[in-house]
Amino acid sequence: MKFVGAHVSAAGGVDQAVIRAHELEATAFALFTKNQRQWRAAPLAEDVIEKFKLACEKYGYTSAQILPHDSYLINLGHPVTEALEKSREAFIDELVRCQQLGLSLLNFHPGSHLLQIDEDQCLARIAESINIALDATEGVTAVIENTAGQGSNLGFKFEHLAAIIERVEDKSRVGVCIDTCHAFAAGYDLRTEEDCEHTFAALGKIVGFQYLRGMHLNDAKSEFNSRVDRHHSLGEGNIGKTVFSYIMRDSRFDNIPLILETVNMDIWAEEIAWLKSQAEIEPSL
């Protein structure tokens, strides 16, 4: 079963994200549970939690179909202790919010060394941050997203993701989300079926498909191996549509949220419908 949707707005309340996903005829969705560009947010009120859970029940969304994203401000590999502590506290709060909403996943960007510590030190800090956060919470899996490698962001190599996972103590509560635009911009080609075979074989070998908890389905305005993160609508960028059809026909991507973060939300419903149609084609495996 393929779960397909988009990162929808939670303006007006988190329950509104559920309604917006339903209106797109999505079978999955992503959301922010708080303002993604602010450190602090009011705690979730009981009535807000209840409305969200009721909306999910009404429209048939389980936690396996929902991939919340944390704040963009959080840097779990921050080289400065005070800033690192602030990020860790905020990340724990994000996990708690997911827990309260009955969600089982939290997607996040791993972190940046800001040119002040080396890659391995930063990866170790990220893993330590995850361990601290998992110890302080329960029931929610920390889902590390690959990055385009823009600036000093880590996570652009599959080896980075594997190194973090290796250091996480509770392997049952860590996973990865692969963003196709980020992978392409980081040098993982996805333009042909053969490219897809090679890239996903590398993912399986280096990270392991048992850790795959979600996908972000985005074409790229950015060039191949440019280390620039610029999303585009499916088929309108430099990747093309092949990889998205490939994913929809491959059982390794079943039962996880497959989320659009493409640039034109006016055509999300069309993109979702097209993705669903690809799942009906003979499987690639």
Curated annotation (Swiss-Prot):
Cofactor list: Zn(2+)
Pfam families from the UniProt entry: AP_endonuc_2
Residues reported to bind Zn(2+) 2: E145, D179, H216, E261
PANTHER family: APURINIC-APYRIMIDINIC ENDONUCLEASE, ENDONUCLEASE IV ENDODEOXYRIBONUCLEASE IV
NCBIfam families associated with the record: nfo (TIGR00587), PRK01060.1-4 (NF002199)
Family: Belongs to the AP endonuclease 2 family.
Entry protein name: Probable endonuclease 4
UniProt source species: Yersinia pestis
Classification of source organism: Bacteria, Pseudomonadati, Pseudomonadota, Gammaproteobacteria, Enterobacterales
